[in-house]
Structure formats: structure tokens, C-alpha cells
Amino acid sequence: RCNLGTGEFKLWSAISGSNFDMVAFSANELGIEINTSTSSTNSLRSNALFRDIGWYHIVVVWDSDNAIDTDRIRAWVNGERITSWRTGNFPGSAGVNSLTNSTVLHTLGAKANVSQYFDGYLAESVLIDGLALEPTSFGQYDSTGTFWTPLSSATIKGLTFVTNGFYLDNTTN
């Protein structure tokens, strides 16, 4: 992440008309929104602030069938789960579908069809379809237990992506 401060900088989005899913930095908070015609807007804004220019490892899980509402959307940054949300409108019932697993435009680094570009570098982008993986599927703490580091590309390529999943490895570009 490079540009800090106000504004929204999209990491990922899917959009269809007024319905959308997105993960973004908004005024130094991590924001997650799922807005579909079958539910009200589910909007989360972290209490944790991300004011440092640097590398962030972000994992977001959308587990629509989870019986616990606060576990239907889960997020981790650098291996630490975010459990404190300034805004926490979680989906009210299990089974709410999102646009993530549909045939609409998906965009990395911007909101689909509009500006709000991410000012940073997306080293690796992964979408896992149908599984709710923990961050340890993608990274781990280093030998000192201090710094969160990504797993090798070969390890991530070995994950199960199911039908609509993907892995974009930009670390060598």
C-alpha cells in the first residue's frame, strides 16, 4: 500500500448494477462490503487503522452458510484476525449469496466500471471458491515469530481452487 489518508482504494470488487462486493482501504481502515438484492448492505469497517506504507497480507473469508453471523465474514491482516469493527453490519441469515461466485465483472485494484484505483502493488491475488481457508493456507510467521511472510508460490498453487478460483502470481513481474 502506498497512498495513505482519505478516499477509497479498492483491492477487489465485483459489480452488477447497484449490487456489489468489495474489499478496500477507506480512510486507513479495512472495509468489506457485500450489497446484493437479497440482503441489505453488509458493511464492515475495521477499528484497526493501516497508516503505514508497507506490505500487508490480507485474507477475507465469505462463509455465507456459517451459523454464527460474525463468522460469515472474517478478515485477517498479517495473520491477525480483525474482531473489532467500527461498523459491523454482518449478514443476518445464513445462505446469502454474493457476487463473488457469479459471472459479473471482477476487478483487482479498482472498483469495477469506475475509478477509485488502488495505489499499491498486489503481489499475489487468490480467490478460493467453496472453501473457507484460514490465513495459514497462504502465509506464516518467520522463524523469529515476528513477521508474517507469504508461503511459496508452489505451495499456494497446490491449494484447491474449485471451479471459479484463481491464483495470480505477480511476484516475478
Predicted regions and their residues:
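Extended recognition patches within non-cytosolic domains
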Residues: 67-69, 83-88, 121-173
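Extracellular glycan-interaction patches encoded by glycine-rich segments
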Residues: 35, 39, 97-122
